[in-house]
Swiss-Prot record:
Similarity comment: family membership: Belongs to the UPF0060 family.
Membrane topology note: Multi-pass membrane protein
Residue runs in coiled coils: none
InterPro entries: UPF0060
Keyword Transmembrane helix: yes
SUPFAM superfamilies from the UniProt entry: Multidrug resistance efflux transporter EmrE
First-listed, main subcellular location of the protein, grouped into a coarse class: membrane
Keyword terms: Cell inner membrane, Cell membrane, Membrane, Transmembrane, Transmembrane helix
The protein, known as: UPF0060 membrane protein Ajs_1326
Pfam families for the chain: UPF0060 (PF02694)
Residue intervals passing through the bilayer: 4-24, 30-50, 60-80, 82-102
Superkingdom field: Bacteria
Gene Ontology CC annotations of this record: plasma membrane
């Protein structure tokens, strides 16, 4: 459960770090948004180091959780409800994440 929670926190840090520059570039918001964006991306990188598994495996498995969190962001922040296809894609990605992270060692 700790691994999954850490992946969720990591995904949120990455999404915020990328969303804030999007607001600046696409919606004309303040360039000052780049300061918390940089901090959020630094947090993202640091959170990835907290996993006890090899870095490549962590990055591969993290992708599955990122997809799920990104679709929640789509729904909550952007106000767009994910489709059944989106949900199926997340299920496949999370299955892959589980296979990678929780394999017998």
């Amino acid at each position: 459960m700790r691994t999954f929670a850490l992946f969720i926190a990591t995904a949120l840090a990455e999404i915020v770090g990328c969303y804030l520059p999007y607001l600046w570039l696409k919606q004309g918001r303040s360039a000052w948004l780049l300061v918390p964006a940089a901090a959020s991306l630094a947090l993202f990188a640091w959170l990835l180091t907290l996993h006890e598994t090899a870095a490549g495996r962590v990055y591969a498995a993290y992708g599955g959780v990122y997809i799920g969190v990104a679709l929640l962001w789509l729904w909550i922040v952007d106000g767009i409800r994910p489709t059944a296809w989106d949900v199926a894609g997340v299920a496949v990605a999370l299955t892959g994440m589980g296979l990678i992270m929780f394999q017998p060692r």
